[in-house]
Amino acid sequence: MKNTILLLNGLWLLGLVACQPKSSSLSECPIVNVRSALQEETPISMKEDVVSIQYIPLETTDSCLISNLLNLQVTTDYMFMYNGKTEEVLQFDRKGKFIRRVGRQGNGPGEYSMISELAVDDSNKELSIFQYGGDALVYSYDGTFLRNDTTVKQAGGMYVFADGKRALKGLVMKPFEQAPWAGALQQPDGLLLKSKSLFPQGLSQDVCFMKEICFSPSTEGVLLFTACNDTVAGIYANGIEPAYVLKRENPTEYYMDIANINKFRDNTVETDQIIGVYDLFESPHYLYLRLYKGDAIFIQRFDKKTGELKSQRIPDDYLECSAAIPGGNVIGMDNDIDGGIPFWPEYVMADGGRAQVVNVDILLALREKGYLKQAPDVLNIGDEANPVVILYTFKR
């Protein structure tokens, strides 16, 4: 199933050893019994965690047509989007009104080539456009090019903490051209404070390759995960440390082979018994996981206070209505609040909420299968309309 859906731009991750704050050792990390939870279906209700939903239809004009949204950054006042098909960065306000294109593709000052991700520093009102193999380009929120950031050449993305420190996501371009770490903590002046690599012990360095990194920011920190390790790392303003242990209980050789450039594509590596992780995110009260095993995809939700773990399989209809991860999919939980689209918000908001995007093709596909009969009217958009951005606020 993992190969039938366009996979995350780069689910990438790390290995771990404690570094300080939240828990002092790996043994103190919360353990999430992923495999055993798959044996029993337990309904998961959005009402237990989500307190409000806001729908924002994006203005549609010839200047801002969105066909393939690959990244979204939601700040206090704006939304910045990377449209992969046209290689454009678009800026909208929080009501969905189009404001401007930011920068342009090219080889001159302030012009970008191949974009990997966007990042925002809401305190300083700055947008960073990360490129494969080049400096990050920094713009003000009014679209003015400010500078090249030469301190993040090895990063493919970042998250800025309130104190100005930055969590960096390692850049993966292609085999043997990658950052020496999967994640790092950096001072505002560019000095690296901590970094973390996560290859299995005993794997020769000349074959190590991390093809996927999951980099999931929240108000608490940034979660990092990689297929070759069951520990989820946390990058926080005061260090890097283990955050969770996912008991996938895959065969020992899987963890070695999935990180080996000579073996990770072999059909024998990802069998129907392997449990993989597409992506994950945190709310103040829960850890959410999107998993696959064979042809099935599951959502699991871990209660950070009680340790309760709920698991449910995603209906095949939702998979058939989806095109890609990230962006063009509704591979999520049933919306039991207002009957809207299945819930899986892939993007973080500056205020700690989460955001999801749905386009007209997905909405039409869901309706053809009999869904969205009670959905809010705002989801009735025209055939040529831009997507709708959905903002979720969580319980505190």
Predicted regions and their residues:
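Beta-strand-rich domains and repeat architectures in extracellular enzymes and scaffolds
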Residues: 53-87
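Short coil/turn segments at the loop-to-beta-strand junctions that recur within blades
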Residues: 62, 103-111, 150-157, 199-204, ...
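Asp-box/WD-like beta-propeller blade repeats and closely related beta-sheet repeat scaffolds
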Residues: 114-115, 132-179, 194-204
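C-terminal motif of bacterial Sec signal peptides marking the signal peptidase cleavage site
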Residues: 16-18
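Blade/loop signatures of beta-propeller domains
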Residues: 23-59
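Blade-loop segments of beta-propeller domains
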Residues: 59-64, 68, 97-124, 131
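Conserved blade-ending motifs and adjacent loop-strand segments that build the rim/top face
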Residues: 244-269, 306-350, 364
